[in-house]
């Protein structure tokens, strides 16, 4: 029997919390760049990517249907550097996230090497749960 670790895929499905929580396993692998996904309430999320060494001009964010794609291509230094130790990675990347229906990108900011992408869920009224009022009705006479 084979066990497949779906957690790397589930982390990138934003707005599918119940599915992600039900299927996520203990082993978590992370690719470059490191990122966090925060949930402030049922309708507001934030993706934060750590992008040390990148400039705002090096980054591109696109929304293709329900697929959010973040790409980065850092400028290469003009002269070759000899590293004694290189702990900071600055390489080109493309990272995509699958958003749930009715999720919208409400904004993006790049401050101190952190790219913040804010997401909002906008449920149409016909999809949102509706409260039905219960009225008192006279009893039926038999």
Swiss-Prot record:
The keyword DNA repair does not apply. It is found in: Cytoplasm. PROSITE patterns: SHSP (PS01031). GO terms for biological process: protein stabilization. Keywords: Chaperone, Cytoplasm, Stress response. The keyword Nucleotide-binding does not apply. CDD domains: ACD_IbpA-B_like (cd06470). InterPro entries: A-crystallin/Hsp20_dom (IPR002068), ACD_IbpA/B (IPR037913), HSP20-like_chaperone (IPR008978), HSP20_IbpB (IPR022848). Residues 26-137 form the sHSP domain. One of its GO terms (cellular component) is cytoplasm. It holds the Pfam family HSP20. Associates with aggregated proteins, together with IbpA, to stabilize and protect them from irreversible denaturation and extensive proteolysis during heat shock and oxidative stress. Aggregated proteins bound to the IbpAB complex are more efficiently refolded and reactivated by the ATP-dependent chaperone systems ClpB and DnaK/DnaJ/GrpE. Its activity is ATP-independent. Belongs to the small heat shock protein (HSP20) family. The N- and C-terminal flexible termini are involved in oligomerization and in the binding of non-native substrate proteins, and are essential for chaperone activity. Homodimer. Forms homomultimers of about 100-150 subunits at optimal growth temperatures. Conformation changes to oligomers at high temperatures or high ionic concentrations. The decrease in size of the multimers is accompanied by an increase in chaperone activity. This is Small heat shock protein IbpB. It comes from Klebsiella pneumoniae (strain 342). The gene is ibpB.
